[in-house]
UniProtKB/Swiss-Prot annotation:
Residues 99-128 form the KOW domain. Stimulates transcription elongation. Heterodimer composed of Spt4 and Spt5. Interacts with RNA polymerase (RNAP). Belongs to the archaeal Spt5 family. Transmembrane segments: none annotated. InterPro entries: KOW, NGN-domain, NGN-like_dom, NGN_dom_sf, Rib_uL2_dom2, Ribosomal_uL24_CS, Spt5_arc, Translation_prot_SH3-like_sf. GO terms for cellular component: ribosome. Keywords: Transcription, Transcription regulation. The gene is spt5. GO terms for molecular function: structural constituent of ribosome; translation elongation factor activity. This is Transcription elongation factor Spt5. SUPFAM superfamilies: Translation proteins SH3-like domain (SSF50104). GO terms for biological process: regulation of DNA-templated transcription; transcription elongation-coupled chromatin remodeling.
Amino acid sequence: MEKPNMRNYYAIKVVGGQEINVALMLEERIKTNNIKGIYAIIVPPNLKGYVVLEAEGLHIVKPLIAGIRNARGLAQGLLPRDEILKIVSRKTVGPTVKPGDVVEVISGPFRGTQAQVIRVEEAKGEVVLNILESAFPLQVTVPLDQIKVSKR
């Protein structure tokens, strides 16, 4: 189950919507009390009501979360490492586009407008567009998840 001096992952139950606040309070407590053995505080965006701690053991985690506002306790057991890797790994979001494609912007200030792809910056998850419906050449950078392919 728990191995000494190993990095284990513990899920802390928190009030929904307060995950970032709890993570910030945990970070502050770790810094002010100079607590060793905590390696990471993870706030999973797709797992509401939980904060994950990477720590050496329960003997460090339990006193750390004691008295933290909006922290409701520990979830039973350890989280498997492969589950944590799924949570923290970056997934490519949005459609696959290439320069020259005509796309429609589906959210943001340019919602509903047609645009042509100039370049794709996959590392940033963004695409540079030339808005076709403007009176003058207008280039904007938009996240990939805010576009939908119209024509290739």
